[in-house]
């Protein structure tokens, strides 16, 4: 029992380290609990700061599920204990003791925990998320669909009924955290993820300097994902007025120099009438 409690505590405490809040504070981004969807998770950070920060938070959140589960497996814990350790990590992410119990929705942490628990299950859940997000462009719908299927994937691939309850509890918690998204989906008010390419292409794209764009009610969205050709055209448009001014100045300077260099007239002065007389 002491071993079980130890792993549960480790999972919960690691899950309580909210990477979304830490990343936003480190890089000077708005507090994800107060801006955007007010959810301290990867999707909201992507909205607030761009793709590079969203992916960073997603990776850290996944590690919070991966590390405690790997630790439990290294300590030769039973599969059901490992599954409860994964549950503890997800609960820690949702209700972190270090951040006044205001956490995220646990999707990335759940996928990370499943990857460490059973790699194929984790891959299937992640693939489900990517496919749903790619076709319907709703992050919440992708999360609901993929996590809901996780317990049934485990039954098919593992066949151990003992691990079904903790995985099913994770599903219930994730669905509860998405209750507002579920209502907005029904009403047709849920914001879509908006990318220039498919979701898979955006995630696989190597350049970290390109920001993602997402629609959100009441928020102005600036598209920073501009092609290089467009950037070049904008730069040239800015430089053209400066070039014209420089040319005008050069012409004025040249005309002054030419005027200064012209020899003075050497024509003799005409004598007055009196001198002639």
Curated annotation (Swiss-Prot):
Composition-biased stretches (Basic residues): 240-253, 262-271
Transmembrane segments: 3-23, 55-75, 79-99, 111-131, 155-175
Superkingdom of origin: Bacteria
Subcellular location: Cell inner membrane
EC number: 2.3.1.275
PANTHER family: GLYCEROL-3-PHOSPHATE ACYLTRANSFERASE-RELATED, INNER MEMBRANE PROTEIN YGIH
Function per UniProt: Catalyzes the transfer of an acyl group from acyl-phosphate (acyl-PO(4)) to glycerol-3-phosphate (G3P) to form lysophosphatidic acid (LPA). This enzyme utilizes acyl-phosphate as fatty acyl donor, but not acyl-CoA or acyl-ACP.
Name of the protein in question: Glycerol-3-phosphate acyltransferase
Organism: Legionella pneumophila (strain Lens)
Lineage, broadest ranks: Bacteria, Pseudomonadati, Pseudomonadota, Gammaproteobacteria, Legionellales
Gene symbol of the encoding locus: plsY
